[in-house]
């Protein structure tokens, strides 16, 4: 067989195989619901936008989503559809590092979500959501090398109880109290050696009463934030 005929046969094989492969994707069932493997491309390109499998209109298994960047695309997210209606989601950077991961139901984040520092395997933020998609539970933020930087408690989307800030050496440097998502109660600031440098009280997000500033264990400044009306109503 001549070289020209071999080339022709090879091209025909590629065309037939390509058509056959394309025929496996993007099918509908008798009710016009997407069914079987699907693969969609960015308009006018051969760059895949997403791929996954449908079962009579419902996503099943793992879907892959790609982000276009000029003439290339890269894996930007995976979604694993579970039988209980939850979706396990992972977002990726261009460098194939995990950006964040957690579960969703519909548009709502639920359960524990973890976010990572840029181009790193170190956790940046860990937080928990309730079934309505609002923050609920302990939220923690970390320094790039893994030390805890901040911790606060949420109850159905609102900060409650104690919020703590930490220096990289683990020392508490700020301590606040929250009630119904407002600063309410005693507040204290410390340096990274644990020495108190500020103390005062909040009432519904506003400073109130006597605030004190410290240096080397001694008070160096005081200021009274007690509210005093400028005008008294006539009797």
Language-model segments: residues:
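Bacterial Sec-dependent N-terminal signal peptides
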Residues: 1-25
């Amino acid at each position: 067989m001549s070289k020209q005929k071999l080339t022709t046969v090879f091209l025909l094989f590629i065309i037939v195989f390509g058509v056959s492969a394309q025929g496996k994707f993007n099918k509908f069932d008798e009710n016009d619901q997407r069914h079987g493997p699907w693969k969609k491309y960015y308009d006018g390109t051969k760059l895949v936008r997403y791929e996954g499998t449908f079962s009579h209109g419902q996503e099943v298994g793992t879907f892959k989503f790609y982000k276009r960047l000029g003439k290339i695309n890269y894996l930007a997210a995976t979604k694993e559809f579970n039988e209980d209606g939850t979706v396990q989601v992972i977002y990726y950077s261009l460098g194939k590092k995990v950006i964040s991961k957690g579960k969703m139901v519909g548009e709502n984040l639920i359960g524990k979500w973890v976010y990572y520092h840029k181009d790193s395997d170190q956790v940046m933020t860990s937080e928990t959501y309730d079934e309505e998609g609002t923050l609920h539970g302990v939220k923690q933020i970390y320094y790039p090398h893994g030390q805890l930087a901040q911790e606060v408690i949420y109850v159905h989307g609102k900060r409650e109880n104690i919020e703590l800030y930490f220096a990289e050496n683990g020392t508490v440097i700020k301590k606040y109290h929250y009630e119904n998502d407002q600063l309410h109660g005693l507040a204290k600031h410390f340096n990274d050696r644990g020495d108190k440098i500020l103390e005062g009280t909040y009432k519904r997000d506003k400073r109130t009463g006597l605030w004190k500033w410290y240096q080397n264990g001694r008070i160096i400044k005081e200021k009274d934030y007690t509210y005093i009306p400028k005008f008294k109503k006539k009797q």
